[in-house]
Swiss-Prot record:
Ranges for domain BPL/LPL catalytic: 27-204
Gene: lipB
Key words of the record: Acyltransferase, Cytoplasm, Transferase
The protein, known as: Octanoyltransferase
Residue(s) at site: Lowers pKa of active site Cys: 130
Associated pathway: Protein modification; protein lipoylation via endogenous pathway; protein N(6)-(lipoyl)lysine from octanoyl-[acyl-carrier-protein]: step 1/2
GO cellular component: cytoplasm
PANTHER family in the cross-refs: LIPOYLTRANSFERASE 2, MITOCHONDRIAL-RELATED, OCTANOYLTRANSFERASE
Family: Belongs to the LipB family.
Residues forming the catalytic site: 164
Amino acid sequence: MRVINLGRQDYLNIWDKMKTFTNTRDKNTKDELWIVEHNPVFTQGVSSKPEHILSNTDIPIVQTDRGGQVTYHGPGQVIIYCLFDLKRLGMGVKRIIEIIENSIIDLLRTYTIKAHLKSGAPGVYIDNAKIAALGLRIKQSRIYHGLSLNIDMDLSPFIQINPCGYQNLKVTQLCDLTDSRDTLNIIAKKLSQILINYVSRNRH
């Protein structure tokens, strides 16, 4: 599996590249993880409703093809896009979602942070505050999109939305929960390796 760090990128540019990669890959194309940090943007999933954006905003709003509802991406947040051939891996969408969520939980455990899942609410939580979101798109057994993990960012844009469709949902970030000085790139590298290890152990 290839891991590519693309640095700071506009969302639309990366979304277009994900679709192109997925549409043109064949049975021999290696799976890839793309590490990205986005410029400020609200993205709406296929289940999102207009009323989940609560106020007028100068932040761009993009209607995407991923699952889920509305969320915010911005500087200080780790994004990892998972471009996988699930048929080749021998797993379904439900299993890959579990792997992504468990990878985030395992990463946070290395910072002595106890994270958990919520029934019916995809993502990863610390107490009642969301620290990570995920949304995927599947096309002919191939997935794209992925996860976002709040590290050290301005959380105020989340006030302008119902994150993931939930009213008054609190959000949190790693820097408020640990004294670690690990950089965004170090954290992204750690999370990528945990994710790769999970996928390797679970493929059939």
